[in-house]
């Protein structure tokens, strides 16, 4: 069942080492400004994303839904999004179509005033697999379930290749995406492997409004599926999960590749407000956080709130030390890049 798989994903993400071997945000070093000429309390962290005003350039990335544990997590995350006036996504919502009894694990966020809500479906479910693809009515139901402002379509074909229940068809996804983008504000999102420039051009041609890079550097779904396979004693899937543990395009490089005129969300391996600042300096409008919030969200709102306060404090300190009075000025702060990220930035030159 999908619900059981989602519960497994939460437990593994919380309790096992499922991150890639290298975090590429560490390959960016920021030039320090010793004389900032900025007062800390005057720093403006506000940002506008596709017409929506956020107090901070932060998106609570799509994580979960479909189980009672997920309901608790989504509730605490929604309270956090309301408190800080930032955007929030939910996990893949196909389960709510298959089992209407899970709907409240997503719709719980409707109890809170969130500046922007992001519904979420998987790209593999846009085309026929062993079962039917999501219909237009299914997508409308999902979108309306949380009164969404945006529709995330997540691309997770690496995960689909690794997991036993994976959907392996992709032909026709862009055509269907183009149809959907005519009716919804679609955000294309990778889930840990990043988008290339070729991908970004295809997505923008299909009509997506923004790209969430979800690059290599943070949670590896190949790693998560490795641990699932280990529990099931599935030697072949264990081998595949281990082989592709570090597959993908680094998050910072993917931001550069996808910066083609429409907003970019930088996600994949963000750990703190310093990483967030680096994402913005590389061209992102928002930074997406998932793993850093998940465990706290399964505990209490106060724990998530404290974590978010630390992220924001880090961001503001970075802005202070780069003489950035606002987010626009932060985008122009100076930095250097180190290997191995530097080589990735040469790919399209």
From Swiss-Prot:
One of its GO terms (biological process) is isoprenoid biosynthetic process. Mg(2+) binds at residue 160. SUPFAM superfamilies: FMN-linked oxidoreductases. It catalyses: isopentenyl diphosphate = dimethylallyl diphosphate. It is an enzyme of class 5 (isomerase). Pfam families: FMN_dh. It comes from the Archaea. GO terms for cellular component: cytoplasm. Its cofactor is FMN; NADPH; Mg(2+). Its EC number is 5.3.3.2. PANTHER family: ISOPENTENYL-DIPHOSPHATE DELTA-ISOMERASE. Involved in the biosynthesis of isoprenoids. Catalyzes the 1,3-allylic rearrangement of the homoallylic substrate isopentenyl (IPP) to its allylic isomer, dimethylallyl diphosphate (DMAPP). NCBIfam families: IPP_isom_2. This is Isopentenyl-diphosphate delta-isomerase. It comes from Picrophilus torridus (strain ATCC 700027 / DSM 9790 / JCM 10055 / NBRC 100828 / KAW 2/3). The lineage of its organism: Archaea, Methanobacteriati, Thermoplasmatota, Thermoplasmata, Thermoplasmatales.
